[in-house]
Amino acid sequence: MQDRQSAQDTQLGESTELTATACGQPLSDSIAAYVINLDRSFDRWQHIQGEAEKLGMAVERVAGVDASKVSLAEAAFYRHRAFVRANGRPMLPAEYGCYLAHMSALRTFLSSSADAAIIMEDDVSLQADLVERAAAILAATPAADVVKLLNHRTVLHRSIARTSRGDDVGRCLFGPQGSAACYLVTRKGALKVLEKLEQIELPYDIALERGWATGLSVYSVKDNVLHLSERSHESQIADRAKYRSIKLRGLRKIPTHIFRIIELTRRIKYALG
């Protein structure tokens, strides 16, 4: 694992180095909170840092990875053909940077003494009861590796447990649910994610929820614990026009359709299992 991490760091150079800044009270020994933030968007960190200070919440900054100048043809762990087959388009450099940043955040968490972590992107709005609700979710789902606390969509949610704080936790029969803007992960879950998601074949948010493929125990809340802020309207990855311009069309997209049908079948089985 150390050699693999070194390969990523060597390729991206200084851009992969993490900086961590804490605000508020000392981080909890049980649940830590991390915010991924690009150096060029430090104003976003200042905003969320201000929110955290007002709420008396401890959050730690993890520097995002700017992959805008990375050649994906030479990108470590990026499996181009598999990615195109699964997504119907090639990966965007910003998606690659996002993926690496989340993996780095998980390594930062594992280097701490915390038992679990809330990993967030810098376009969420913090809530005062975030850590308390996360603790209640862990208590209600002790076998969980990952629990998504924010999703773009929650369709055909099958409830597994209801927490003492009223959150409904379960799995969805339809997806992808989208977004890795806020999720809860345990230590064993972080170790599994680093191992199972090392090869990049899907955007990080989609890869994260594929427990049927990775062997992770992944759950989701029915109603978001946090919500996206106004900053989320300014995408740091790409706009819709960019996505449309690189999508495969016609017969070339048949393998993608087949992959998605299989994925839906496996998702349903996983959610009902």
Segments from the language model and where they lie:
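An acidic/histidine-cluster motif and surrounding catalytic segment
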Residues: Q2-D3, D9-M120, V124-G273
